[in-house]
């Protein structure tokens, strides 16, 4: 059916071609198509048979073509550097192979040129190698000699000559490095080595000295002591080490800086005395006593506040440390008892409170300093008396006998703490007639009448499970 349709179409074409172009004597025996020339007929017949007699003669190429014009077109790909594919599109496989071949050829030419250049320059290269070795040896020797110059410089750079500080440290920044005159290389090296050695010794000694300093040395004008030390050592002309760390400032030092210095001579004498304090510190000297004595010895005015209570010795024989500990929040009744036991005189707690009020009134009266300037009044902080559940509401002050009775009772209760039963514990917590006003618990227990009776808290005896008639569940 299909063959009949194809024959009809070819017959119509042959008739139309014959009518247009003239006769077509060469007719295809398979499809009955006519051609004007014989080569056209043979080329057409090869499409039916699949014969390809025209083969490519390029080495490595196995392509064959049915027409000769196709073979000539294919040969242009091998001959030209930039081959053109069919219909203007490049074939990737052919272009890649061609590029590889071109690169191999170029690389071979380069290798040949390099080998020729090496052969021509072989005689001159041997003459150049020997002076190069000599130059390398000379540079190595120079580097070894130069290392002796750089090592002391590195040691100097590693140690800082000065520290950055605030305005307080700027006042005492007299540390300076003298200029090194470059006369001879050997002289400069010796000077640098001596300076580095001196600096290391000074730095180690300063570290040891600062570690041994007590707290009082840090609170006593560090800037003046450092300036005096630098003035004494400035004539030596050597490198001076900076102290390892700045002296720490406390609350007393801020009050100390508020007082002006009278004269330059007094400041110099004050710095010399501070230097003596730094070199010979007192081991067991309290902070407040050191500062107060320092101001008293130098004649410097100072504001009157709670910090200088050590100047006013109490008539009862209490020291300044005992009074200061009275106002600190962390001290308890036990510390006051220890201080009381160390002194020979026995004073009750009410006398201490009276002395405190007298001191506060004296301080309120002094509103001017030695220079006639008004001072800020410090408010006297009175202790708050809290009612105790274990103390009867008595209007009079606690006597000495009641104080010691309460102390002994508390010590006995602490000794009997492990063997105390529930009844003793109840009696201990509800001692409402033998205690003082000072020892007040933070949370007072409720009165004895509000608690349930002991009969309600007794455990109820229940029968054992085995004695009960229990049946298993059904």
Curated annotation (Swiss-Prot):
<feature type="compositionally biased region" description="Basic and acidic residues">
    <location>
        <begin position="66"/>
        <end position="83"/>
    </location>
</feature>
<dbReference type="Pfam" id="PF00096">
    <property type="entry name" value="zf-C2H2"/>
</dbReference>
<keyword id="KW-0678">Repressor</keyword>
<dbReference type="GO" id="GO:0000433">
    <property type="term" value="P:carbon catabolite repression of transcription from RNA polymerase II promoter by glucose"/>
</dbReference>
<keyword id="KW-0804">Transcription</keyword>
<comment type="function">
    <text>Involved in glucose repression of glucose metabolism genes.</text>
</comment>
<dbReference type="InterPro" id="IPR051007">
    <property type="entry name" value="creA/MIG_C2H2-ZnF"/>
</dbReference>
<dbReference type="GO" id="GO:0005634">
    <property type="term" value="C:nucleus"/>
</dbReference>
<feature type="region of interest" description="Disordered">
    <location>
        <begin position="360"/>
        <end position="401"/>
    </location>
</feature>
<feature type="zinc finger region" description="C2H2-type 1">
    <location>
        <begin position="26"/>
        <end position="48"/>
    </location>
</feature>
<feature type="zinc finger region" description="C2H2-type 2">
    <location>
        <begin position="54"/>
        <end position="78"/>
    </location>
</feature>
<keyword id="KW-0863">Zinc-finger</keyword>
<keyword id="KW-0805">Transcription regulation</keyword>
<feature type="region of interest" description="Disordered">
    <location>
        <begin position="306"/>
        <end position="325"/>
    </location>
</feature>
<protein>
    <recommendedName>
        <fullName>Regulatory protein MIG1</fullName>
    </recommendedName>
</protein>
<dbReference type="GO" id="GO:0000978">
    <property type="term" value="F:RNA polymerase II cis-regulatory region sequence-specific DNA binding"/>
</dbReference>
<feature type="region of interest" description="Disordered">
    <location>
        <begin position="1"/>
        <end position="24"/>
    </location>
</feature>
<keyword id="KW-0539">Nucleus</keyword>
<keyword id="KW-0862">Zinc</keyword>
<keyword id="KW-0119">Carbohydrate metabolism</keyword>
<feature type="region of interest" description="Disordered">
    <location>
        <begin position="45"/>
        <end position="131"/>
    </location>
</feature>
<feature type="compositionally biased region" description="Basic and acidic residues">
    <location>
        <begin position="1"/>
        <end position="23"/>
    </location>
</feature>
<feature type="compositionally biased region" description="Low complexity">
    <location>
        <begin position="310"/>
        <end position="325"/>
    </location>
</feature>
<keyword id="KW-0238">DNA-binding</keyword>
<dbReference type="GO" id="GO:0008270">
    <property type="term" value="F:zinc ion binding"/>
</dbReference>
<feature type="compositionally biased region" description="Basic and acidic residues">
    <location>
        <begin position="93"/>
        <end position="106"/>
    </location>
</feature>
<dbReference type="GO" id="GO:0005737">
    <property type="term" value="C:cytoplasm"/>
</dbReference>
<dbReference type="InterPro" id="IPR036236">
    <property type="entry name" value="Znf_C2H2_sf"/>
</dbReference>
<comment type="similarity">
    <text>Belongs to the creA/MIG C2H2-type zinc-finger protein family.</text>
</comment>
<feature type="region of interest" description="Disordered">
    <location>
        <begin position="440"/>
        <end position="474"/>
    </location>
</feature>
<feature type="compositionally biased region" description="Polar residues">
    <location>
        <begin position="387"/>
        <end position="398"/>
    </location>
</feature>
<keyword id="KW-0677">Repeat</keyword>
<feature type="compositionally biased region" description="Basic and acidic residues">
    <location>
        <begin position="45"/>
        <end position="55"/>
    </location>
</feature>
<dbReference type="InterPro" id="IPR013087">
    <property type="entry name" value="Znf_C2H2_type"/>
</dbReference>
<feature type="compositionally biased region" description="Low complexity">
    <location>
        <begin position="462"/>
        <end position="474"/>
    </location>
</feature>
<keyword id="KW-0479">Metal-binding</keyword>
